[in-house]
């Protein structure tokens, strides 16, 4: 029987030591252990008597035999509990052994106040426990229900709830900021790519069998502008030169075909042909090209100011070209042939008339524009006012 109620009984055989030491040591006081006496009587006033050893078992097993005198009230024996009280909780795992031989009632095993009080009637013992003061030792199962929920009460405290809400808000805000940054970066990269596609005129870069895949690429900066000069590979320049010799002006359809074949953009092909035409003009110093042995004039873009310039040219008065020497000789011969028709009555001599004829010819060719009109009267000799004639 390994109970703390039995171990003190064997103390007289082993020098006051228990047979099976445990974490706790419940013993009777020295006075009780030496004399093995039990005090009976109301309030402990009755005289004590020696209790034989063979009646000890009867004392503990109260239901079968023993002293059951209702006139006397059993004084509870004082038990000195030694050992750590926190380790007493481990005793719950050990198998319980009832003091009465059979498990009639678990409430009769009185652990709370570590006092052995046996009475003939179980009701009296229960009432006696209620009358006593609160026990000095409190075990986990004896504590009130509210003390075990200190952690729960702390969790549901207002301060803890506020801190938890603040932490949740901070976490949500950080996640939202991260997602927003990712979305903005993706949006910026998408707009940048769309801008590059628009600059390249939507032409797809395809690599053919004869094309050099390491062709020059467009180097663009952050603002989308091209940095540096565009370089072309040997194969690309050769094909472009062939196409230029065949036709210096490309249609849009042919330009797209060439750009796909050479892995270039439509804009690059267009600029290359423009530069090549300007270079050809500078080398040959001409304004026309020869294509397939034919004379091909360069195209002129119709502008709004062309019609206005043509109208102004029509309104301008064309300047008369200076007459050549052949025309002067022809006029002299013609005037000599009509010499008979001129009036000679007012002239004094033949020599004078010849001089007059010569002067009229000179005045007709070298006078001002208003005097060239034949209806005007030409004054031949101002000294001789009478010598006037009319040119027909």
Curated annotation (Swiss-Prot):
SUPFAM superfamilies: Homeodomain-like. Its main location: nucleus. PROSITE patterns: ANTENNAPEDIA, HOMEOBOX_1, HOMEOBOX_2. It is found in: Nucleus. InterPro entries: Antp_homeobox_TF, HD, HD_metazoa, Homeobox_Antennapedia_CS, Homeobox_CS, Homeodomain-like_sf. Gene3D superfamilies: Homeodomain-like (1.10.10.60). This is Homeobox protein Hox-C8a.
């Amino acid at each position: 029987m390994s109970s703390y109620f039995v171990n003190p009984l064997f103390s007289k055989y082993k020098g006051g030591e228990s047979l099976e030491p445990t974490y706790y040591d419940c013993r009777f006081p020295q006075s009780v252990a030496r004399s093995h006496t039990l005090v009976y009587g109301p309030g402990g006033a009755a005289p004590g008597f020696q209790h034989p050893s063979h009646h000890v078992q009867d004392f503990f097993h109260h239901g079968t035999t023993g002293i059951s005198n209702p006139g006397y009230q059993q004084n509870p024996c004082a038990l000195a509990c030694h050992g750590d009280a926190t380790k007493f909780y481990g005793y719950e795992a050990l198998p319980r052994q009832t003091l009465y031989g059979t498990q009639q009632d678990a409430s009769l095993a009185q652990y709370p106040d570590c006092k052995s009080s046996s009475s003939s009637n179980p009701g009296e013992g229960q009432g006696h426990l209620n009358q006593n003061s609160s026990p000095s030792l409190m075990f986990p199962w004896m504590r009130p229900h509210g003390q075990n929920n200190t952690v729960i009460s702390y969790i549901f405290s207002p301060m803890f709830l506020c801190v938890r809400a603040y932490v949740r808000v901070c976490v949500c805000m950080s996640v939202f900021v991260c997602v927003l940054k990712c979305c903005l970066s993706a949006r910026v990269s998408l707009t940048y790519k769309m801008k590059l596609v628009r600059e390249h005129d939507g032409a797809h870069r395809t690599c053919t069998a004869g094309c050099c895949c390491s062709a020059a690429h467009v180097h663009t900066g952050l603002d989308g502008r091209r940095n540096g000069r565009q370089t072309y590979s040997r194969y690309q320049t050769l094909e472009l030169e062939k196409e230029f010799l065949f036709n210096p002006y490309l249609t849009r359809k042919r330009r797209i075909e060439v750009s796909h074949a050479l892995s270039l953009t439509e804009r690059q092909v267009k600029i290359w042909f423009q530069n090549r035409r300007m270079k050809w003009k500078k080398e040959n110093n001409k304004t026309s090209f020869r294509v397939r042995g034919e004379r091909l004039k360069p195209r002129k873009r119709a502008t709004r100011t062309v019609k206005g310039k043509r109208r102004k040219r029509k309104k301008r008065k064309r300047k008369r070209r200076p007459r050549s020497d052949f025309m002067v000789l022809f006029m002299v011969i013609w005037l000599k042939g009509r010499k008979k028709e001129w009036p000679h009555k007012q002239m004094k001599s033949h020599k004078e008339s010849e001089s007059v004829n010569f002067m009229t010819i000179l005045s007709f060719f070298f006078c001002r524009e208003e005097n060239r009109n034949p209806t005007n009267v030409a004054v031949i000799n101002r000294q001789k006012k009478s010598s006037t004639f009319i040119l027909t």
